[in-house]
Amino acid sequence: MGSKVTGVKIKGIGKYVPEMVATNEDFTKIVETSDEWITQRTGIKQRHITNGEPTYYLGAMAAKAAMADAGVKAEDIDLIIATTVTGDYFTPSLSCLIQREIGAIGCIAFDLNAACAGFVYGFDTAKRYLQTGDGIKTVLLVASEELSKFVDYTDRSSCVLFGDGAAAFVLELSLIHI
């Protein structure tokens, strides 16, 4: 006789990056650097940069892509967790702006602020909500950053590192029989 273990299933994945691309060659025009210097130290060849799109827009586009991939509608979402350090406003939260953009009115929505680890903390939080069995069946987890608006483009050591974009997962509970 086997037992059941509860896990989390990634039902859908989405991403969104702005169209504008900044290459390493572009950075050689604004700071003393070279493509070789950047690539050897970071592995980065290019990064996407917004052209006025707000952080919530990036997140909403990734969310819509994840929902399409999962085959779920806005009304299927029970919880939205958004992670960012570059939100557009102090309030409303990024999650509430994404909630409005995708039409998931009525679900729980909140932000987590944990910088680079935000998506990992968000995944763990989503898992715990799903495992409570308290009505949360589908979670939309979104990480959205627009770091270009805070970059010091005179600091060679950091300006070459950051770009803008968003990723999203649609998560559901999964029972594993072992």
Language-model features: where?
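Short beta-strand segments
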Residues: 11, 83, 113, 139-145, ...
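Conserved small/polar residues in nucleotide/adenosyl-binding loops
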Residues: 176-178
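Active-site PLP attachment segment
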Residues: 119-123, 163-168
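Conserved catalytic cysteine-centered active-site region
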Residues: 37-41, 45-57, 85-139
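Flexible, glycine-rich active-site loops centered on histidine and acidic residues
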Residues: 131-166
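Conserved "HGTGT" condensation-loop signature of ketosynthase/thiolase-family condensing enzymes
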Residues: 1-78, 102, 173
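Short glycine-rich or small-residue beta-strand-to-loop segments that form or flank ligand, phosphate
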Residues: 79-85
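Short acidic, glycine/serine/threonine-rich loops at helix termini
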Residues: 21-22, 91-93, 151-156
